[in-house]
Amino acid sequence: MKKRSSRAIALLLAVVMVLALAACGEEPAVDPAESGEPEPSGETPAASGSGLVIALPGEPQSLDPYAHSMYYNFMAATLIFDTLVTKDADGNYVPELATEWEFTDDLTLHVVLRDDVYFHDGSQLTADDVKFTLDTAAASSFSSSIFAWYDPDNTTVIDPQTIDIKLKYAYAATLEVLASIRSAIVNKAAYEADPASYTRTPIGTGPMKVENWYSGDRIEFVKNEDYWGEPVAFDTCTFRIIVEASTRTIELETGGVDIAVDLAYSDWSRIEENPELVLVSGRTDNMASLVFNNSIEPFNNILVRQALAHALDLESLVQVCWEGTAEVAEGYYASSMLGFKAEGPREYNVELAKELLAEAGYPDGFSFTYTTYQTNLNQTFAQVVQSMWAEIGVEAKIEIVDLATFTDMNNNGQLTTALLTPSVAISDPSAALILWPITRTISLRHNDQHIQDLLDAGSSTYDEAERVEIYQELQDYLYEMTYTVPVAYPTFAFGAAADVQGFNFASNQIPDLTTVSVG
């Protein structure tokens, strides 16, 4: 028989009170005189019909697409750069910088480029720029994981408009990677001449270019009048750096910005109820999972794992921890991706959980240390699962460490259990299942060769129907083995003025700004 966890609901009230009293620290301001950059001149631009103004939650570390992994940095990249291919509204790959592409064999992608594309500095795009971009991406610690398939040594520039991209192994998601803004094509000559400058004033082929960057305040873009493709509908774009979420919302309400990024959960309903604003929200590609360390007792016992899973009232857990802004996970990756299969959620059943524990040899339960790091979400999650597991006699002793310690413990397999929400780089199961390769040293440690065999088959099979069958078999097996518990699909929200058109939610949290118009 199902029942709601009264302890979990009570915890919600306690947590809300604690958070209401929490103080927020302020980030130190950057002195433009010390940074060697121009001081802001005049007032910060207000939202207007000829310009687009966007409030960011932080300052980009870099505009070099291979020197960061932050989603709002990539939002700028959609204006500055182009990719070889892109995807249309139906999910089909269509030309962008490339006019033609073909797999001539499993390890060779033959690509022909447009001959009318020029960078912001007036130089023409060539296949040398493409090879340099892919070489850079594969070597960067920020992007190497999604370019592991790329073979720089055997990739060949045929002529200025033609390149044979070589793969180290067959990889079905190659075009998905190349269509991502994480594959933005950079200017080889400019990048090599001054890598430091490229982080702040990158040279791309996109519809806008960087004009000014005032540290701690704003980044200004102007239209590229010589753009080869469809021009954007605004002459200027300004990224305003507004760290406080409440201030971003106020700026949106008062017309100071057209779009606000990463709204506070508490402001979502406020935006929805305002007829002059629109909440643009949806599920992200990411998923939060409760991971068991399957290499240590008692978590190496499938009956224990199943017992702990059945003891979780996921509906209450997600409601409490994500404050109503996430959905209970039904499977092992986002439902929008190829081959998704709804496997759960697993039934909440305390009596069954107790029976499974007894069958596993733990009729009186057991105790263990649950280690997490200090964020509101992590601490609340730890407290709620602690309460739920206590109902079946399992004592989870909560240990709070700093992020660096947590990361080190996870990477060395020292956590007993953990809430992990890995960032998914591309919308493909080969990337979404990032926790599962057997070679990873994180605390999941399933050491199950069958999983690795299915992962390899799914990522290397080019036939889409076969890929679906493989990934669905894998999801069935993951559900059966209960190495993890899929918990939540987090949602994400932007706010926009009602007169902003063409601003569409993207599950990777990187909306395409080139489609936006104002007024």
Residue ranges: model-predicted function:
Residues E102, F147-A190, N212:
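Surface-exposed binding/hinge segments that line
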Residues D88-N92, A179-V232, T236, E351, ...:
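Gly/Pro-rich hinge or "lid" segments in bacterial periplasmic/extracellular proteins
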Residues T126-T133, P160-D164, G206-P207, F234-T236, ...:
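Alpha-helical secondary-structure segments
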Residues L356, F494-G519:
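Long beta-strand-rich cores associated with HINT superfamily self-processing modules
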Residues A8, E323, E327-E359, L377-Q379:
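Structural transition elements
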Residues E225-R270, E395:
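Ligand-site clamp/hinge motif
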Residues A55-T104, D135, I203:
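N-terminal lobe/hinge region of extracytoplasmic solute-binding protein
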Residues H110, E395-F406, A431-A498, G519:
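Extracytoplasmic/peripheral linker and loop segments enriched in polar/acidic and small residues
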